[in-house]
């Protein structure tokens, strides 16, 4: 199975669930950028202190800082496979990530795109019961996702890395479809 992966997909497609399962089953390291940022802050590293300062001001952490944290994490893996989730979110970030991965001799082997009809996504997200998840907010999140992510999807499609997977059905059925395209 391919060992260096990116996960893309709309909110509610099951990226977190599938990432955890695949990483557990195949010994991959799950690199969620949100989790990585929180871990760096918690550890009190220089990168974490910089990230904390930015987040405390209510600002977005810069791409360069996220890339530095990703680079530090990947550099410490000693050849272990990985699954990057939550980054890159746009083509500019992807174009910044690619040379970093080449430098580490860890290029992306596959980009998994979890696809699901909007109606099913809305149903899934509403069933989570989160306060901020009403249908209007969810529909807007899906529009924003499509606008921001379509060029990124095309970027990886043109590079021959994109693997689309239908994200409907049972968790196990989806996992098997993902494993099938990564074999």
UniProtKB/Swiss-Prot annotation:
Alphabetical keyword list: ATP-binding, Cytoplasm, Kinase, Nucleotide biosynthesis, Nucleotide-binding, Transferase
UniProt cross-references to InterPro entries, sorted A to Z: Adenylat/UMP-CMP_kin (IPR000850), Adenylat_kinase_CS (IPR033690), P-loop_NTPase (IPR027417)
Its domain comment says: Consists of three domains, a large central CORE domain and two small peripheral domains, NMPbind and LID, which undergo movements during catalysis. The LID domain closes over the site of phosphoryl transfer upon ATP binding. Assembling and dissambling the active center during each catalytic cycle provides an effective means to prevent ATP hydrolysis.
* Gene Ontology CC entries for this record: cytoplasm
Task: Provide one Gene Ontology biological process annotation.
Answer: AMP salvage
- Keyword Phosphoprotein on this protein? no
Q: What is its main location?
A: cytoplasm
Q: What does this protein do?
A: Catalyzes the reversible transfer of the terminal phosphate group between ATP and AMP. Plays an important role in cellular energy homeostasis and in adenine nucleotide metabolism.
Cell compartments where the protein resides: Cytoplasm
Q: What is its EC number?
A: 2.7.4.3
Q: Which residues does the annotated region (LID) include? A: 127-133
Question: What is the name of the protein in this document?
Answer: Adenylate kinase
Source organism: Synechococcus sp. (strain CC9311)
What pathway is this protein said to act in by its record?
Purine metabolism; AMP biosynthesis via salvage pathway; AMP from ADP: step 1/1
Q: Name one GO molecular function term.
A: ATP binding
Note down the stretches annotated as region NMP: 32-61
Which chemical reaction does it catalyze? AMP + ATP = 2 ADP
On subunit structure and binding partners, the annotation says:
Monomer.
The residues that the entry says bind ATP are 12-17, 128, 169
Family of the protein in this entry: Belongs to the adenylate kinase family.
- Enzyme class name: transferase
Where does the chain bind AMP? 33, 38, 59-61, 86-89, 93, 130, 141
Q: Which PROSITE patterns match?
A: ADENYLATE_KINASE
């Amino acid at each position: 199975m391919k060992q260096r992966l990116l996960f893309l997909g709309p909110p509610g497609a099951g990226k977190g669930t599938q990432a955890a399962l695949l990483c557990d089953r195949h010994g991959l390291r799950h690199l969620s950028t949100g989790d990585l940022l929180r871990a760096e802050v918690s550890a009190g590293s220089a990168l974490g202190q910089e990230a904390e300062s930015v987040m405390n001001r209510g600002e977005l952490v810069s791409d360069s800082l996220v890339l530095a944290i990703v680079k530090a994490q990947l550099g410490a893996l000693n050849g272990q496979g990985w699954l990057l989730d939550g980054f890159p979110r746009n083509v500019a970030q992807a174009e910044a990530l690619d040379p970093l991965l080449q430098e580490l001799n860890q290029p992306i082997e596959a980009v998994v795109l979890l696809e699901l009809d909007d109606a099913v996504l809305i149903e899934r997200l509403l069933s989570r019961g989160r306060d901020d998840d009403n249908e209007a907010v969810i529909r807007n999140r899906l529009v924003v996702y499509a606008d921001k992510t379509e060029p990124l999807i095309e970027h990886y499609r043109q590079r021959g890395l994109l693997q689309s997977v239908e994200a409907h059905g049972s968790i196990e059925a989806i996992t098997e479809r993902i494993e099938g395209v990564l074999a």
